Each structure stands twice: as structure tokens, then as C-alpha cells.
């Protein structure tokens, strides 16, 4: 896949994330909560000024710097073909899209717009970019633990 295709894939994911957040700001904020599956899933507007577990409140530039470092690492890995398997490349693109989506919020709004609430467990409200990061990290862990190791052994 070419660098242009990588950029288009990330751009599409960021557009989806930002479109959902725009809807949340313009529509959901005035409503508050919309139950989708009562007792299971709802949409609840939240302006999140902290990271996971309420740490690093209002540390916008620390989050931005961390995201830039991660994005530089992803660009390096993709540009130098350090990651060969498609699942490894896809995982990095998904992580990049999530990082960019949340950085846009932090820089523009000084908070991240969250809206997805799982009601059946005690869990923080999250957004599409958070899903991208979690899914991307899970895919990368799978790649690293099972595929990367096999490819390395095959090269020996």
C-alpha cells in the first residue's frame, strides 16, 4: 500500500471520528443522554479534560507531544517497511487515526468530546477515536506476539 493510501485511510477514520464528535457537540450536548439499549448502551455527552483514570488533568500539550512522538514512530515504521504484515500496518494506521482524532479535540477545544457509555459495567465514557486506539493496540499486540515472531523465525 502506498503512502497516499495510508494517508487516505487515516483521513477517512479521522473524518468519521470528527463527524460523530460534531454531532455530539451540536445535537447530543443539549439532550444529554440518549438510551440506545436501555441498561446496556447509551450516548451521553461529556467534555473530557483528563486522561484515563482522571490523571493529568488539563495537560493538553503533554498529550499533544506524546501523540506526535507516537505518530512519528508510526510514520517511521511504515516508511521504512519495518512492519511487513498487513495486520501490523493496519493496526498502526488505526492507532494513528485515534491519536489524531483526540489531538484535534485537545488542541481546538482543550477537551475531548466523549459520548459512548456502556451502562452494564462501570466504565468511562469514550469516543470513536478511543475505539480506534484500543482496537489498533489489540491488533498490534496480536501482530507482535504471533505474526512478527513467526516472520522473524522464518527469516533465520
Where do the protein language model's features map onto the residues?
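Alpha-helical transmembrane bundles and membrane-interface segments of multipass inner-membrane proteins
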Residues: 1-156
Amino acid at each position: 500500500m502506498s503512502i497516499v493510501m495510508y494517508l487516505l485511510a487515516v483521513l477517512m477514520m479521522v473524518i468519521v471520528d470528527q463527524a460523530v464528535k460534531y454531532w455530539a457537540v451540536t445535537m447530543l450536548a443539549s439532550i444529554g443522554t440518549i438510551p440506545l439499549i436501555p441498561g446496556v448502551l447509551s450516548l451521553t455527552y461529556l467534555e473530557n479534560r483528563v486522561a484515563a483514570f482522571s490523571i493529568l488533568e488539563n495537560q493538553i500539550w503533554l498529550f499533544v507531544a506524546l501523540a506526535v512522538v507516537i505518530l512519528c514512530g508510526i510514520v517511521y515504521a511504515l516508511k521504512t517497511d519495518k512492519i511487513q504484515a498487513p495486520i501490523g500496518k493496519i493496526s498502526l494506521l488505526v492507532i494513528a487515526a485515534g491519536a489524531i482524532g483526540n489531538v484535534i479535540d485537545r488542541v481546538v477545544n482543550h477537551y475531548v468530546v466523549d459520548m459512548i457509555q456502556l451502562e452494564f459495567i462501570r466504565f468511562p465514557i469514550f469516543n470513536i477515536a478511543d475505539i480506534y486506539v484500543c482496537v489498533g493496540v489489540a491488533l498490534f499486540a496480536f501482530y507482535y506476539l504471533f505474526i512478527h515472531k513467526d516472520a522473524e523465525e522464518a527469516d533465520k
